[in-house]
A protein has these predicted regions:
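Generic structural signal for hydrophobic core residues of well-folded globular domains
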Residues: 20-24, 61, 90-94
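Short, amphipathic alpha-helical interaction segments positioned at domain boundaries
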Residues: 79-115
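Short, cationic, amphipathic peptide segments
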Residues: 104-151
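Short, Lys/Arg-rich nucleic-acid/phosphate-binding segment
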Residues: 72-80
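Short amphipathic alpha-helical interface segments
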Residues: 2-45, 52
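Short amphipathic alpha-helical interaction segments
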Residues: 45-64, 78
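Non-catalytic, well-ordered alpha-helical scaffold segments
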Residues: 10-14, 55, 64, 81, ...
Length: 151
């Protein structure tokens, strides 16, 4: 039996990292619906389990030291959220896994080739590919890395 909730978790983590990296170092509001789509509450007004899982992924990343935030907005968003030093250094560092094609240093400037090897660019590429197996492998790899710089 496939663990679809784990596939969703890895996709949520990737999306959270990409959204927060795009605005770093500014603090922002991160809405669950921007991560996993709109909520579909039940007849009692309770959040859909998928929506709850998206919120839980955001909180888990904070508990594990990848995000800092000031407050929650109900169970729908994190307020004043920003990548932690640990997450920023992980995402901006050179990937040790190299799941994706590297830019050819003969055809592009060295700075562009080096940038293509960062974890954030590798993550963008893997997410665009749409393979949940490759995404799971890459996010799991990143989460297993020791913090850079004591972060």
């Amino acid at each position: 039996m496939a663990d679809l909730h784990i596939d969703d978790f890895y996709r949520d983590v990737a999306t959270i990292f990409l959204r927060l990296y795009a605005v770093f170092p500014r603090k922002t509001i991160l809405y669950v619906e921007d991560i996993c789509g709109p909520d579909q509450p039940d007849e009692f007004g309770l959040h859909h389990p998928r929506f709850q899982a998206g919120f839980s992924a955001m909180v888990w990343l904070a508990e594990e030291g990848y995000l800092n935030f000031q407050d929650t907005i109900r169970a729908e968003a994190l307020d004043q959220v920003v990548l932690s030093q640990k997450a920023f250094l992980l995402l901006s560092s050179r990937s040790k896994l190299g799941l994706t094609e590297q830019a050819d240093e003969d055809t592009v400037p060295p700075s562009v080739a080096e940038q293509s090897r960062t974890n954030i660019n590798q993550l963008r590429h893997v997410l665009r590919e749409g393979s949940s197996i490759r995404l799971q492998k890459y996010v799991a790899f990143m989460l297993a890395q020791d913090p850079i710089g004591g972060g």
